[in-house]
Structure formats: structure tokens, C-alpha cells
Amino acid sequence: MAIAIAVESGVDPIDIAGSAPKLSGAAGRLEEVNVGQTFNAFVDYAHTPDAVSNVLSAVREFTAGRVIAVLGCGGDRDSSKRPLMGSALINGADIAIFTSDNPRSEDAQVILQQMVGSQEISDPARVIEDRKSAIEYAVSIAKPGDTIAVLGKGHEVGQEISGEKHPFDDRVVLAQAIAGAK
């Protein structure tokens, strides 16, 4: 749409094409984290069952290896979607890692139990409450050609636990975990 408007406004299509490589997407929306690793790594804000399914389906298109996904559900939000989110994670990822994501005033363990529901979690899938540890685990098992997708927080730079906001940025934590694993 923006390209059509630009052309209609008299911008030369060659100028538009030359600018395309400089464009970037929205922060935290399928945002690549690349520190020279041999696997793909992305952070996305996906926080609905459809969004989780769509992101995992999209990354599968270009993944030669396994899709490793890390996901949590926010506390004090619609608890009825938690089992649906868990199902989208299990169905869309080769390796599903359930974790916390802004539990707010709720017990993170209860949220995780609701996400997992009656689904069977078997190795190498995991339930790891601490989000940083969950991301580090994903990095530790990634192989060349795999894709890690860290979902749920996207551009957010905090983790709310028991009414307190703690600094936390999936992009930074993922980059640090990758750099530390080299």
C-alpha cells in the first residue's frame, strides 16, 4: 500500500526499490536476533493462539532443521486461551518450551499448568518457569539449520511479577545466550 501511494505521489519506482533493503519491520514482530550463530533466532509478540500458529508456520517455511519455540502466557489475562496457546505451541514446534510471561499477580506455576493442560510433555520439550533459563535451554539445544522462536513478549522490555516490573528484553536475553554459548 505504501509503495502504491509513493508511486502515485510521483516517487520513482527505482528509488523505492533501492530503499527496500534499508527497511526494517516492527520491533518485536518476527525480529531476527543474529550474532553470527549457525541457526535462526527470532523474537515475536505472538500472544494469541492464532498468532502462535501463524509465526511457527511461517518460520517452518525456511527452517531446514527443527523449530524450537519458547512461549508463556500473561497473568491477569484471559485464562481460557492458555490451553489453546499450549496446543498451538505443541502442534507448531518440534520442541516446545513452556515458560513464564508477565505472571503479574498470578502464580506462574498455575499459568503453566493451564497452558500444558492434559497434553503430554516429553523430552526434549520442557516446562521451565524462569524465562531466561528457558531461552538459554533453547539455545543450548539448537543445532545448525534450526530456528528458535521466542514468543509472547516481542518488543516488551519488562517482566511483571507480583506487581513489580523487572527489566527483561527477550531480544537481549536471546542475544546474550547465543553469544555465551559460542
Question: Where do the model's predicted regions map?
Answer:
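ATP-dependent carboxylate-amine ligase
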Residues: 1-182
